[in-house]
UniProtKB/Swiss-Prot annotation:
It comes from Ascobolus immersus. The keyword Heme does not apply. GO terms for biological process: chromosome condensation; negative regulation of DNA recombination; nucleosome assembly. PANTHER family: HISTONE 24-RELATED, HISTONE H1. GO terms for cellular component: nucleosome; nucleus. Signal peptide: none annotated. This is Histone H1. Residues 26-97 form the H15 domain.
Length: 213
């Protein structure tokens, strides 16, 4: 027994073999490969699954289980809101629009120290308005009666045109009667005859000179 234990102690314990460093992955994560494929293809309505797979296989070294890993990565990305399939699970794939980062809250501008307010000049007391003399009920009644009386008065008649004054008729002058010696009555003419116009005097002839003998 003692010999066995001594031999065991004599043999040094075997060192654990150093671990081999893990092989570096030959491609980035499937999420990154999907994102790069969609970005590079630049299709407006999204890229089809076949186009994305073809891009990944031609640019990265993938293993045999590529299809399984591709489908799982796509499903997880849709659930997390990283990818969008507008036409359903078998349709095209698009990148989800990133929401704009919330704008940083603006710092409130430091308020300037308010200048001390000047004491407002005391306003002059407004002069009390004269109370309007209340109209008595009697005055109101008189006004109403006057309005009614004015409404009842008929419109004034037009002034009658002045009558034309007849021109006075001239009476004939009384006829004067005269008696002649023989007793006959004669009527004197009342109308005065116009005085006969005097003939213009004929011009005097110039005296002829006497002939000399």
């Amino acid at each position: 027994m003692a010999a066995a234990t001594a031999s065991a102690a004599a043999t040094p314990a075997k060192k654990a073999a150093p671990k081999k460093p893990a092989a570096a992955p030959e491609h980035p994560s499937y999420k990154e490969m999907l994102t790069k494929a969609i970005t590079e293809l630049k299709e407006r309505n999204g890229s089809s699954r076949q186009a994305i797979k073809k891009f990944i296989q031609s640019n990265f070294k993938v293993k045999d289980n590529f299809d399984v890993q591709f489908n799982q990565a796509l499903r997880r990305g849709v659930e997390k809101g990283e990818f969008v399939q507008p036409k359903g699970p078998s349709g095209t794939v698009k990148l989800a629009k990133k929401e704009k980062a919330a704008a940083a809250p603006k710092k409130p501008a430091a308020k300037k120290a308010a200048a001390p307010k000047k004491d407002a000049a005391p306003k002059k007391a407004a002069a009390p308005k004269k109370a309007a003399a209340p109209k008595s009920a009697a005055a109101k009644k008189k006004l109403l009666d006057a309005k009614k009386a004015a409404a009842k008065k008929p419109a004034a008649k037009k002034a009658a045109a002045p009558k034309k004054v007849a021109a006075p008729v001239e009476k004939p002058a009384p006829v004067k009667t005269t008696t002649t010696k023989s007793g006959r009555v004669t009527k004197a003419s009342t109308t005065s005859k116009p005085a006969p116009k005097k003939k213009a005097a004929a011009p005097k002839k110039a005296a002829t000179p006497a002939k000399s003998s």
